[in-house]
């Protein structure tokens, strides 16, 4: 079976988005995961105080890495309800995850088919379906970290690598303010 690039990209997007939509559909109005509750506390603190780094005794590290919650607050400031803003961040993060995973593997192997297969293999893991569908900092940090790899892989073959390396640097800074382990 040979897919066009457009068909492969559509399949990658579907593999990325549908599992998170199905998992979130079980309780669309409330985050029920333990980590999600902890991050919602940090998000609520940022929204109510209009400032970062408010203490969260439930997850002390969370306020020190507010990238996820700050991004959600920015989306919320567009007039979108808090839960909907959080869903936007989760879904966009998932789209970035599958597209940069596909691109990274394609850049490293030279095969667009390998990129699509990498996404399909990752999509069958429980981590992909559940852990990376949560409202938690790794959901945003992993795609950002993988974007660094993708941009550096592209830069090595580029005639003008500086913009790509600049983008990788921005992504590294975003990871640094989003997750303490990634």
Residue positions per predicted region:
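Membrane-embedded, hydrophobic transmembrane alpha-helices
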Residues: 1-6
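Residue-level signature of transmembrane alpha-helical entry/exit and packing/kink sites
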Residues: 9-13, 115, 164-168
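Short hydrophobic alpha-helical membrane-anchoring segments
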Residues: 24-25, 103-107, 150-155, 176-180
């Amino acid at each position: 079976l040979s897919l066009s690039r457009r068909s492969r990209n559509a399949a990658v997007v579907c593999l990325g988005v549908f599992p998170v939509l199905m998992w979130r559909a079980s309780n669309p109005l409330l985050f029920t995961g333990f980590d999600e509750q902890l991050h919602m506390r940090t998000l609520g603190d940022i929204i109510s105080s209009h400032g970062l780094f408010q203490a969260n005794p439930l997850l002390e590290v969370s306020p020190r890495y507010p990238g996820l919650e700050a991004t959600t607050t920015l989306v919320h400031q567009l007039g979108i309800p808090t839960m909907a803003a959080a869903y936007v961040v989760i879904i966009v993060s998932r789209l970035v995850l599958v597209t940069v995973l596909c691109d990274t593997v394609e850049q490293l192997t030279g095969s667009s088919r390998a990129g699509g297969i990498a996404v399909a293999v990752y999509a069958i893991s429980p981590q992909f379906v559940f852990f990376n569908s949560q409202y938690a900092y790794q959901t945003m940090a992993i795609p950002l970290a993988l974007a660094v790899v993708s941009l550096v892989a592209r830069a090595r073959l580029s005639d003008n690598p500086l913009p790509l390396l600049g983008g990788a640097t921005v992504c590294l800074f975003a990871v640094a303010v989003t997750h303490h382990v990634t």
